[in-house]
């Protein structure tokens, strides 16, 4: 079984991923670009602030009523750093197969390439110590890099448990062949493979759309992985952003 790191079971939703308790690293206020994407008042996915007006997330996180929270660490507390924004425009990548989202049961031939989407905020974000954009990559990530994934996804692989605070986990950037061997679904050159081959470090349910930062550089966003999460020899898959830098920049420029 596979899951998009949100819930493919949702009619308008996606897939999600989360880090395990034993592999967490301190995350509070260290990821000022991390964004919480909601459908109505329910948390759905992570996202990444690219500039004051734009958030990047996964295309499988598409929904019909977005709300975005920036500067947030704890879901249960009203924090002084919180910024709430609506979304004026959602632009999934034109080559992402949106038909995969409508109560679709994942199949071995499914191709989740191009799993990214831009959200234009209805009001620009205020840049503060805990709300800051991150730049797009300008070069390929290096295999073996230490990567950091973050999110509010499940910290347990089967009976999902969700943290109050933003969680981070260190993962290793692996050859795509490792994911291709581990999974039946297609792994393409528009994807990255990251995890720990002995398990225990992973993204999971509701981490979708969150950042994958390798050697300090944004290189991916969480896309899909195995179910249950964190299985040994079954790393997760991330959208490879260097492949989409031109589309992202052009789309932002053409939608001022």
UniProtKB/Swiss-Prot annotation:
GO annotation terms (biological process): positive regulation of phosphatidylinositol 3-kinase/protein kinase B signal transduction; proteolysis; small GTPase-mediated signal transduction
Residues of the signal peptide: 1-17
Highest rank taxon of the organism: Eukaryota
Changes after translation: The presence of Gln-24 prevents cleavage of the activation peptide, which remains attached at the amino end of the mature alpha chain.
Cofactor note: Binds 2 Zn(2+) ions per 7S complex. The Zn(2+) ions are bound at the alpha-gamma interfaces.
Residues where Zn(2+) binds: 77, 84
Disulphides: 45-61, 147-214, 179-193, 204-229
Keyword Signal among UniProt keywords: yes
Molecular function terms from GO: growth factor activity; metal ion binding; serine-type endopeptidase activity
Region annotation (Activation peptide homolog) ranges: 18-24
Keywords of the record: Disulfide bond, Growth factor, Metal-binding, Serine protease homolog, Signal, Zinc
Stretches that traverse the bilayer: none
Cofactor: Zn(2+)
Subunit structure: 7S nerve growth factor is composed of two alpha chains, a beta dimer composed of identical chains, and two gamma chains.
Family of this protein: Belongs to the peptidase S1 family. Kallikrein subfamily.
Name this protein carries in UniProt: Kallikrein 1-related peptidase-like b4
Gene name of the encoded protein: Klk1b4
């Amino acid at each position: 079984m596979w899951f998009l790191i949100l819930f493919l079971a949702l009619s308008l939703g996606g897939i999600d991923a989360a880090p395990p308790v034993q592999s967490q690293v301190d995350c509070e206020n260290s990821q000022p670009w991390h964004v919480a994407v909601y459908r109505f008042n329910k948390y759905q996915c992570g996202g990444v602030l690219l500039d004051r007006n734009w958030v990047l997330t996964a295309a499988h996180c598409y929904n019909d009523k977005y709300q975005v929270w920036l500067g947030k660490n704890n879901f249960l507390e009203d924090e002084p750093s919180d910024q709430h924004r609506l979304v004026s425009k959602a632009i999934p990548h034109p080559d992402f197969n949106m038909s995969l989202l409508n109560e679709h049961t994942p199949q071995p031939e499914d191709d989740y390439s191009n799993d990214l989407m831009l959200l234009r905020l209805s009001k620009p974000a205020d840049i503060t110590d805990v709300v800051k954009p991150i730049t797009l990559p300008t070069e390929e990530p290096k295999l073996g890099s230490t990567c950091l994934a973050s999110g509010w996804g499940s910290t347990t692989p089967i009976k999902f448990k969700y943290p109050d605070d933003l969680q981070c986990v260190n993962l290793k950037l692996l050859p795509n062949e490792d994911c291709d061997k581990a999974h039946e679904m297609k792994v393409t050159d528009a994807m990255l493979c990251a995890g720990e081959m002995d398990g225990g470090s992973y993204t999971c349910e509701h981490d979708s759309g969150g950042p994958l930062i390798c050697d300090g550089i944004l290189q991916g966003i969480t896309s899909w992985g195995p179910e249950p999460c964190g299985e040994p020899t079954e790393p997760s898959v991330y959208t490879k952003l260097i492949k989409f830098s031109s589309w992202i920049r052009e789309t932002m420029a053409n939608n001022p």
